[in-house]
Design a protein with these regions (language model features):
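Short beta-strand/loop motif that positions the catalytic acidic residue
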Residues: 223, 229-231, 235
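C-terminal catalytic histidine-bearing segment of alpha/beta-hydrolase fold enzymes
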Residues: 127, 237, 244-292
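Short substrate-entry loop that stabilizes the transition state in hydrolases
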Residues: 72-75, 86-125
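The conserved beta1-alpha1 loop
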Residues: 81-85, 231
């Protein structure tokens, strides 16, 4: 359970990670030009709710950090990014007991990973330009504060779609992708069009380039990292066809890719299937690191 007690503070990091962190109490819930953090506890993990000012538009944005018990910032770690689904926010992967969320948390705990869950312009992000800019900023800041060795971006539904989008846009940043029940083609996807248009800055007809560049199937050659996806044959909310095509293209390019397609499955991934997908990417990272 997440404690209801929290303290708002500003963290200003001066110089290197060994320098003193200056904490200033936050009044009236305002962020004073820096980073603020609410420290809380959940079973087996330390939780921090972080606020920051977006470099893109100067708005206050948020993400949650989860550290496993005994976590040390100086030790090299894998960073696991958990992206929420449509209509949710940063708390989905922290609090919810649905299989996709529980598997992700327990996977991070199992390997002592650092886990973050951003709002990325909740609740209707679909990894539009603002969400993309925020996530890039977050990852840069986290790398300054922690010894991050590799980055896995994961999520379900909109979050899985967004993981693929961000990975294709920034293969130099992302080392592995886990996408549960995603779409891989924003040009053909037909649901949530009003929300997506708001996020992308216009409709498919108005800004076609945004929909194309955010269609991972059409940018598959940029997915050079291990990729694991789950799909359901009877998923009508986010149909699997584009992702099945993406997998075939990645296999044709001899990429490390894992598919768990449940022909009778709907818009959900079981705990076991989610954990299997996460393990595939983790193993891919271990093999890559051993070859370096």
């Amino acid at each position: 359970m997440i404690s209801a007690k929290s303290v708002d503070v500003v963290e200003r990091w001066v110089g290197s990670l060994t320098n003193l962190v200056l904490f200033v109490m936050m009044g009236f819930g305002l962020v004073c030009g820096g980073w603020s953090c609410q420290a809380q506890e959940i079973t087996g993990m330390k939780l921090s709710d972080v606020s920051f000012v977006s470099e893109l538009d100067k708005t206050v944005q948020k993400y949650v950090v989860l550290e496993s018990d005994g976590f040390r910032r100086s030790t090299k770690k894998t960073l696991l990014v958990a992206l929420h689904g449509h209509g949710a926010d940063r708390w989905q992967y922290v609090r919810e007991e649905r299989d996709e969320c529980r598997a992700t948390r327990e996977f991070a705990m199992k390997y002592g990973m650092l886990m973050i869950s951003p709002d990325y312009r909740a609740r209707t992000s679909w990894m539009g330009p603002a969400a993309e800019a925020d996530l890039k900023q977050i990852l840069a800041e986290v790398r300054e504060l922690y010894s991050v060795e590799s980055i896995i971006v994961s999520g379900g539904s909109m979050g899985g779609t967004s993981a693929l989008i961000f990975g294709a846009l920034h293969p130099d940043i992302v080392d592995g992708i886990v996408a549960m029940n995603p779409t891989s083609n924003m040009e053909e996807y037909g649901q949530f069009q009003e929300a997506i248009a708001e996020s992308y800055g216009g409709s498919k007809a108005e800004v076609p380039q945004e929909y194309r560049k955010r269609s991972s199937e059409l940018q598959f050659e940029r997915l050079t990292m291990p990729v694991a996806v789950t799909t359901g044959g009877k998923d009508t909310l986010v149909p699997p066809e584009s992702t099945l095509r993406l997998v075939e293209k990645l296999r044709g390019a001899d990429r490390k890719v894992f598919l768990n397609h449940r022909s009778e499955g709907g818009h959900a991934t079981t705990y076991e299937d989610g954990m299997q997908a996460l393990e595939f990417v983790a193993e891919g990272l271990r093999l890559r690191q051993s070859e370096q």
